Swiss-Prot record:
InterPro entries in alphabetical order: Acyltransf_C, Plipid/glycerol_acylTrfase
Expression tissues: Widely expressed.
Class of enzymatic activity (EC top level): transferase
UniProt-recorded name of the protein: 1-acyl-sn-glycerol-3-phosphate acyltransferase epsilon
Spans through the membrane: 15-35, 345-365
Amino acid sequence: MLLSLVLHTYSMRYLLPSVLLLGSAPTYLLAWTLWRVLSALMPARLYQRVDDRLYCVYQNMVLFFFENYTGVQILLYGDLPKNKENVIYLANHQSTVDWIVADMLAARQDALGHVRYVLKDKLKWLPLYGFYFAQHGGIYVKRSAKFNDKEMRSKLQSYVNAGTPMYLVIFPEGTRYNATYTKLLSASQAFAAQRGLAVLKHVLTPRIKATHVAFDSMKSHLDAIYDVTVVYEGNEKGSGKYSNPPSMTEFLCKQCPKLHIHFDRIDRNEVPEEQEHMKKWLHERFEIKDRLLIEFYDSPDPERRNKFPGKSVHSRLSVKKTLPSVLILGSLTAVMLMTESGRKLYMGTWLYGTLLGCLWFVIKA
């Protein structure tokens, strides 16, 4: 009985972070809406600067729970620049935590507010979040023939013209890799083989459209491409097999003791501009990822297994940087919920904010 209670309590470790992260969303959206109204007649750069600061506050709260609260050990391989840069961030995609890994790296460059994502189109219907991500610079894209490159190009060029700092996160695989999804993996490998490309084992065949449009639209604005390969330690089983990477709730329940991040900075001038050449280049980058992952999971040498080649640095994010965000947003939300009018405003923001956000996407379409 006692053991069952302990196990149940352990499995509920995600509850507090979930309540605070989701519970503060209306508070955050109200703060952003107020700033949006006040800045209507101000220069666009001023609005963007403050919006980036607001975004940084919320994402620091996310990092408090996903780094400080979980106590995950982050091992960084490669030299992450200390200065801010305008970049496209390319990574393997296997977990819902992947977007937070991008936050982790950006925070170490003091560029957290500049992070913007290329997202699956269906995510725009997420209550409150879907609408706000678009306002912050996120781009929703559809797959294959439905991909609207003109819309993406137009939005990115508007940011370039405005001088907006960009830390654009793209997952070129388009969907999460999962070793148990054998049909998806087989289809991806067949797609590569039919086009004379190397067949990949631990990643899916990358798609070029979003990456090419992003690079082509922002090449005069970019400093580099960040090529990132991530492994969530704790899901390997040996012999090239591993279980599913942790979900966000599993990660918050501390089911990932170590996070291995291999970082490679590629100067903008080293990236081919023509689409077919870039397609080959991108696949070659994923071949490198695949070799890194094969070495990590399948190396015959036990000393080389469960780590990337080269030296790693144990990177820590100070709680002094993240805890203030928890206190600020948590306190503002608590104050709002203390009064009847505040509770009505809070619930109204959840309801009408979601409906108006969906309506905005419908009208925009």
